[in-house]
Amino acid sequence: MQDALTAISADHAPGRSQGSERLRLIWRNIFPFVVVGAIWEIIAWSGIFPRRLFPTLEDVVSSFVNLTITGILPHHAIDTLIRLLSGFALAAIAGVTVGVLMGRSRRAEDILLPLVSIGAPIPGLAYAPLFLLWFGLGNLSSVLLVGFVSAFPIIFNSWTGVKAVKEIWVRSAQAMGADDRRLFRHVIFPGALPYILTGLRLGLAQAWRILVAVEMLAAVPWGLGWLIFGARKFLNTDTMMAGIVVIALIGLALEKFVFQKIENYTVVRWGMISS
C-alpha cells in the first residue's frame, strides 16, 4: 500500500512542479505592472496632483472601456497600426538591405556610412516639416517619415551583424564549395540575424515615437497620437492614458507574437542565444 501511494505521489509531482513553475512565471511577468499600478494609485489618491490631471486607474479603465465600446478607440488604434506597419515595413526592407550591403561591400560602406552617420543623430521631428512640404498633409507623409526615421537603427545593426560574422565560418563555407548565394543564405544572414532582430526592435520603438508625434502635425483625422494630443487640449488625462495603454499593448503584442516567435524559431533554435 505504501509503495502504491509513493508511486502515485511520484506520478503527480511533475504536474505540481510544472504548475508551480507556470504560476511563478505568470507572477514574475505581472509583478512589475502590479508595482507600477500600486505606485500610480498612491500618487493619484494622495492629492499631489489634481484628480483631473492624474486620474486613478479606475478612471483610466472606465475611459478605456467606454472608448472601446463606442468604437472610437479601435478606430484610432487601427489607423495608427496601419501607418506603423506600413512605415516599419519600408524601414525593415530598406534598412536590412542597406545594412547588409554595407557589411558585404567595402565600397558601399565607404559611400553610405558617412550619410547614415550624419542622418541618424538628427531627431525624427526635425525631418517632419520637410516631409510635410514634400508629400503634403495626411497618411503618405506620415508613413514615409516613419519609414525613413526608423530605418537608421536597422541599418546600423544589420551592418554590425554582418561585420561580426566570424571569418572562420566564411572561410569554412568557402572551402566546402559554397557560392556567394549559399554563403549569404547559410552563413552571413543567420550569423547576423541576432543583430538584425535587435535593430528591428529598436526601429519599431523609433517608429512609435515619431508616428505618435507626427500624427498631430500631419493633420490626420484619426490615430492614437491625434487622440492623445486632442485629449490634452481638454485636460482629458484619462483619455490620454487610455491611448497610451493601447500603444503599450500593441507594442507588447508585437514583441510577444512577432519578434519572440521569430527569435525562438531561428536564433534560439540554432543555439546562438538562450531563450
Walk through the language-model features, giving the residues of each:
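Periplasmic/extracellular loop-to-transmembrane helix junction in inner-membrane transport proteins
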Residues: 14-23, 46-89
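Transmembrane alpha-helical segments of polytopic membrane transport and secretion proteins
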Residues: 1-34, 256-275
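Hydrophobic alpha-helical elements at and bordering transmembrane segments
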Residues: 64, 73-77, 81, 111-118, ...
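Hydrophobic alpha-helical transmembrane segments of polytopic membrane proteins
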Residues: 224-262
